[in-house]
Amino acid sequence: MYIAGVMSGTSLDGIDVALVHIEGSGVDSKIELIHFTTVPFCNDMKNEIQQALSIETSNVQLICSLNFKLGLCFANAVKEVCKEANFPLRQLDLIGSHGQTIYHQPKQEGNIISSTLQIGEPAVIAYETNTTVISNFRTMDMAAGGQGAPLVPYSEIILYRHQTKNRLLQNIGGIGNVTVVPSKRSKESVIAFDTGPGNMVIDEVCQRLFHVPYDQNGWIAKQGVVVDEILTYCMNHPFLNMKPPKSTGREQFGEAFVTELLNRFKKHSKENILATVTMFTACSIVHHYKAFILPYYEIDEVILGGGGSYNNTLVEMLRNGLREEKCSICIQEDIGHSSAAKEAIAFAILANETYHRNPSNVLSATGAKNSVILGNITFPPYADENEANI
């Protein structure tokens, strides 16, 4: 099957689309990446999304409108990846669309129950592409008592399980998340959880203090020095000592977190603040390994993915933090994969599993009570001989 996986993450840097060919289903699936592209959000769209993400500025009319606007953006991004790959859109069997997360409440707080909302109307995507769309992957896991995240571990088992090596898959997107993938000969279970901020705090500081979207290659942070009092403040965040399974997001490490941090520590130089929040991401990852993984698993290899794997300063901080551990550290490209395409590929794989009526949540990752089939199915408006028959 030819499937387009569509991902718009918490970093808001654009729409990632992976055109993937998948043979079979389950852990023995054969996955081939045909083409990957990122379609950036225009400034107006990015501003609308940021407005919708903030409780202070959001409103129901905006979210309602944005749901349809993003659906059109996602459809156009699918058309773009097919155009770049010289692949006929009519031959596409499925689209797996994660959507744009507007709010994620992993655990109940008072009368606010655990819930999640991703937008990007699948009917618009299906209409514009005349292709079956599978979307809204997180809600069924939450209905089954899970946190709806992380969902990527299922794809990581398929793509990265090694015959003899125990691997850690560390994604550094807006949020950091880790998956422990034991070797095929191991009897240990897969576990996965969010490790805290990935690029989210770094990018927000860059945009506010340096007026650039992100710290390319970690060059700005390299000019500063880590400030202990800022790092201690960050590392005291209660999320870090919660036991897995757990997930987090912009609600904990978004604009409000950065505003409070900058107000508290405005006496320090811009470069030092950026260096410190970069170290915060590295230390939060290392902390989670040492607290929740390394005492129970012998790890051979750490594989970094996501945009943060291109931040050389951050990667060097991670290497220093893990220097005493007996494991190698590499990035996705070192083993023939794409750091940028990883999550979009994951949602193509999840769409394929839903098409085959296979459960694809990992209970040890999300905390769900049951293995469940993820996602909602939206059929295209017109019958087509190439349409996937679900």
Swiss-Prot record:
Ranges annotated as spanning the membrane: none
Pfam families to which the protein is assigned, alphabetical: AnmK
GO MF annotations in UniProt: ATP binding; kinase activity; phosphotransferase activity, alcohol group as acceptor
EC number: 2.7.1.170
GO biological process, one term: 1,6-anhydro-N-acetyl-beta-muramic acid catabolic process
Catalytically driven reaction(s): 1,6-anhydro-N-acetyl-beta-muramate + ATP + H2O = N-acetyl-D-muramate 6-phosphate + ADP + H(+)
Pathway info: Amino-sugar metabolism; 1,6-anhydro-N-acetylmuramate degradation; Cell wall biogenesis; peptidoglycan recycling
Keyword Cell membrane: no
UniProt keyword Kinase present: yes
InterPro entries, per database record: Anhydro_N_Ac-Mur_kinase, ATPase_NBD
Binding positions (ATP): 9-16
Enzyme class, broadest EC rank: transferase
Source organism, top-level taxon: Bacteria
UniProtKB keywords: ATP-binding, Carbohydrate metabolism, Kinase, Nucleotide-binding, Transferase
Family label: Belongs to the anhydro-N-acetylmuramic acid kinase family.
HAMAP family xrefs: AnhMurNAc_kinase
Function, as annotated: Catalyzes the specific phosphorylation of 1,6-anhydro-N-acetylmuramic acid (anhMurNAc) with the simultaneous cleavage of the 1,6-anhydro ring, generating MurNAc-6-P. Is required for the utilization of anhMurNAc either imported from the medium or derived from its own cell wall murein, and thus plays a role in cell wall recycling.
Protein name, as recorded: Anhydro-N-acetylmuramic acid kinase
Lineage: Bacteria, Bacillati, Bacillota, Bacilli, Bacillales
